[in-house]
Structure formats: C-alpha cells, structure tokens
Amino acid sequence: LVSLNESQFARELQKDFVNFYEPSTVNPYIPLAAKGPWIITTHGAVVHDNGGYGMLGMGHDPTEVMSSMSKSHVMANVMTPSVTHKRFADTLKREVGHTRGACPFDRFICMNSGSESVTVAMRISDINARLMTDQEGPHQGKEIWTVALDSGFHGRTDRPASISSSCLPKYQKKLASFRGKSNVRFVIPNDIHGLKQVFSDADREGAFVELIAMEPVMGEGNPGLMLDREFYDQAISLANQHGTLILIDSIQAGIRGQGCLSIVDYPGFED
C-alpha cells in the first residue's frame, strides 16, 4: 500500500466506508503522527493544522487531556449512582459560569452525541408546544413553527435535521419523510429585522413559534460565525413575549472558538 501515491493510498484506506461528506472536504493527506498543530503524513509532508470547526483548541494529542482520559474512572450510566457523578457535576459547576461567579444551571443531562442532545432539547420544546397549543392553552389550536438560523447545523437525526439549513435541502429532495415539511422558518444570523418579521408573520397567520434554535458559534454550515449580543437579546425578548423556548446549541464549535463550555461565559454574554 505504501508504494501507492498519497491519493491512491487514501482511497484504498477508505474504500470500505461510506463518507457522506462532500469529496472536496476530505483531507488530501494521511496522518502518521500529530502533536499540537503539527501533522506528519505517511508521505513525509509536515502540515500545520490550525484546526477545523470541531477541533479542540488544545491541538492534536494534548498531553494533559490524554493523561486524564487514560486513568481509571469508575462510573456507569445514570442508573447506577457513582462517586464520579458527583465529582463530574462539581467540576461542571465550577467551569460553567466561572466568569459570572456561579453556575446558572441547576441540573445537567448527559447524552451520547450532539445530535442526540439536540433531540432531547427539542423533545422538551415539544412538551412546551403541546401545553401552549392544547385546549385552553394560551395558543390553543395554532399551527406550530420553529425558527432556526440560515446555514446552521444541529445534527442528522430527524428533528435536528429539520432545523439544519446547511443540509435540509438535500433531505427534502431525497427523503420521503421530509416531503412537505414547511413549519421551519430560517433567519439570517444576526438579522434582527428578519427575526422580528418571522414573529410578525406568525402573529398574522395564527402560528405559535415553539423554538428559536441558535448556534452561538456556527459549525459545519458557516464555521466560526458568532452571534451578536444584540441579536441574542432580541431573540430572548421575543421568546419571553410569545412563550417560545430558546435552544443554544454549542457543542463542538463553541469550545473551539471560545475555549469554554457555555455561552454564559462568552465575552459579552456573562450577564
């Protein structure tokens, strides 16, 4: 295999796998070793890798992280109480909210992936939408809309995919289950007028906006684009006025772009 040129070698290595990303996004080299921002390829190249949207800011093979992960951690899932659960929760509470003096969250939910996390968040939103639109609810009988940002990406499972502008057109074109789905309204990031217009349209057409989904630092769809505080404040204001929930989806790109776990610690968002 190593006698092949690098592009042939790469194709041979991945021929047994389905790659659902665009061919142009596949890296044109094969890493042999990596540390920090540096990669050595199988064919002798030295690559300086500044990192993609999902890369931790610590670079490749960070010594402290790898050392901690290699230790024995006695912890099962949430059905089995563990001392490590308490240790982990205390660590989260110290980290999340460290710029504002205290953690603003009472409890945490741990999921297996970003897409599953968004699915659970949207399930919570779904419960609220049911309460709002059921008989005797404040928005009884109204059509339900969701609002998300143009070029956003929230996952490839069903509901997260339905609010992911970056890949939704392909799903609508190819998937029967996405045929006719039209209850999502997309807004250009940081377009306050556009956001207000969606809520005006909802009021005029008798719809209830169940959710505003936002990435504070955008990932796959528009890597690195950040929310303005003014746009965020307007979204919160509209949500409070209409009984809408806010979903802040900060899983990979947020850590990479800001170096912290939650928007509550981003510069300008500490309050």
Language-model features and meaning:
Residues S164, K174-L175, S182-I188, I192-D271:
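Conserved PLP-enzyme active-site core in the AAT-like
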Residues V47-N50, I109-M111, A148, I246-D249, ...:
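General beta-strand structural signal in soluble alpha/beta enzymes
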